[in-house]
Amino acid sequence: MLKLIIPTTMLLPLTWLSKKHMIWINTTTHSLIISPIPLLFFNQANNNLFTYSLSFSSDPLTTPLLMLTTWLLPLMIMASQHHLSNEPPLRKKLYLSMLIILQVSLIMTFTATELMMFYVLFETTLIPTLVIITRWGNQPERLNAGSYFLFYTLVGSLPLLIALIHTHNTLGSLNIMLLTLSSQNLTDSWSNNLMWLAYMMAFMVKMPLYGLHLWLPKAHVEAPIAGSMVLAAVLLKLGGYGMMRLTLILSPLTKHMAYPFLMLSLWGMIMTSSICLRQTDLKSLIAYSSVSHMALVITAILIQTPWSFTGATVLMIAHGLTSSLLFCLANSNYERTHSRIMILSRGLQALLPLMAFWWLAASLANLALPPTINLLGELFVLMASFSWANTTITLTGLNVLITALYSLYMFIMTQRGTLTHHIKNMKPSLTRENMLMLMHLFPLLLLTLNPNIITGFTP
């Protein structure tokens, strides 16, 4: 595990010791060299738990998320270059340091084998993200967004800490493998139900569940490009990862405790998709679409079947790449038009034809067009929820329809139509930007050829 953590940590001295004209080149190339390391963890006999030490281990659920995390750092660095072009070298280095610290804490969170260590690292990821949003965001509202993000996450996580201390007092251990393999036989009592709620609430806020999602659109809209990318692609997946780990430990309870949350996430999925159709702000639309996709993942995890777990894992990876790509595209528009309002940036296909192709590809991936892995994940979840209760097909089917509507609405509003009068001249798309979009789409297309490496705990 250290072969991943140590090189990533060593990016910090690399950043601070680089000359000012070499900062971007050094960090991008070295983080790209580090990114294939998790591919080595895929090569495991019979999908077992691969333990490196007492503290860290990886398994078929962790490894795809590690791959996503490491792949995203060079992309975030590439995307941030224009945003930081007027900053002094010291601030550039500070910004990159925040991204690297966030990367290290995410890697350690995904691989932690001890629940208290997982909790501490889970909370650690909050600090660099908060600094990135509140220091480098564009509008003054970023402070409000930062406080929403901080307090929602903290209030959601405190009950988890109390539940962990309680579990440690009663069982004497918080080792994830030990707790998963030993049968708990939790009875249906008030105290156990409250403990289940305390365990799940932190992750439901992080996912976010509909009703606890108000911090997400604010944080996404006000964050700089790298903040939006890492929030959408990896930080939301922390919630899904935690839920998958802990619902297995609390297994008999989840059966009946899940009902209200299943109903809420299925309903929230429709509501947030419908909200997307009314958005004028491009980043806000993509943020609400993230809430809608994550509601599908919550549904899958709470159904508790091997198929639904597979679907949740695939959907998390697919959504991570797709939403990050959409935020990059929205940012490239914002850098040229200085506005996130879709009506003010219409007709851009005439000026940036190659960018229009990336927009089309991203919109189609977002609406889960075959043969993307987004479709694979959605099909797994749809089939699992249909076999759990036939009536869910009306809600999930409606959601698929609305997703297609708002994805195409987003594409048509930004790319088609007549150009607005205030756009007289516009910079052409840079090679860096095209490369960035390609590096998002490339893994999506490659995973289409071999999706079984990201199917997680296959039955």
UniProtKB/Swiss-Prot annotation:
Predominant place of localization: mitochondrion
Superkingdom field: Eukaryota
Keyword Metal-binding: no
GO MF, one annotated term: ubiquinone binding
UniProt-annotated location(s): Mitochondrion inner membrane
Any Gene Ontology CC annotation: mitochondrial inner membrane
EC number: 7.1.1.2
Top-level EC class as recorded in UniProt: translocase
Reactions that this protein is recorded to catalyse: a ubiquinone + NADH + 5 H(+)(in) = a ubiquinol + NAD(+) + 4 H(+)(out)
Topology of the protein relative to the lipid bilayer: Multi-pass membrane protein
Coiled coil: none
Pfam family, one: Proton_antipo_M
Any one biological process term the GO annotation gives: mitochondrial respiratory chain complex I assembly
InterPro entries with a match to the protein in the record: NADH4_N, NADH_Q_OxRdtase_chainM/4, NADH_UbQ_OxRdtase, ND/Mrp_TM
Subunit structure: Core subunit of respiratory chain NADH dehydrogenase (Complex I) which is composed of 45 different subunits.
NCBIfam families per the UniProt record, alphabetical: NDH_I_M
Known role: Core subunit of the mitochondrial membrane respiratory chain NADH dehydrogenase (Complex I) which catalyzes electron transfer from NADH through the respiratory chain, using ubiquinone as an electron acceptor. Essential for the catalytic activity and assembly of complex I.
Protein name (database record): NADH-ubiquinone oxidoreductase chain 4
Organism, scientific name: Hylobates lar
Source species taxonomy: Eukaryota, Metazoa, Chordata, Craniata, Vertebrata
Gene assigned in the entry: MT-ND4
